């Protein structure tokens, strides 16, 4: 499994399918967002108290945009409160990167900046042009995380 840190704080990661839970445990990941069509094999080996979000989408047309926004905001909120989040799909290039790019816009990057950043870290990312065009059009937004 190729686990790649997206931010310098190493709180946001992308990967393909999880086939080894050791890197997840080693990096202290406490939230997994699974975009693939199958539940991860060996899920019972996941670290205790990991939040597992399962939202399978096809690597074709854009998913339901309001739900994509909610998921992007959730990832941004978690990263903004020092959780360690892994977003993954089968290969870690399109669906997972779409969600991460959406989250990055909620953390203040424009869609174009997010796309450039993600492609620099992961060459070939967002080769689904429908997804890439959507990301390019996203404005920079800054969430305000409130911890009660």
Language-model region placement:
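Cysteine-based protein phosphatase catalytic domain of the PTP/DSP
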Residues: 2-84, 105-134
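A phosphate-binding catalytic loop at a beta-strand-loop-alpha-helix junction
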Residues: 78, 82-101
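Charged C-terminal helix
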Residues: 127-148
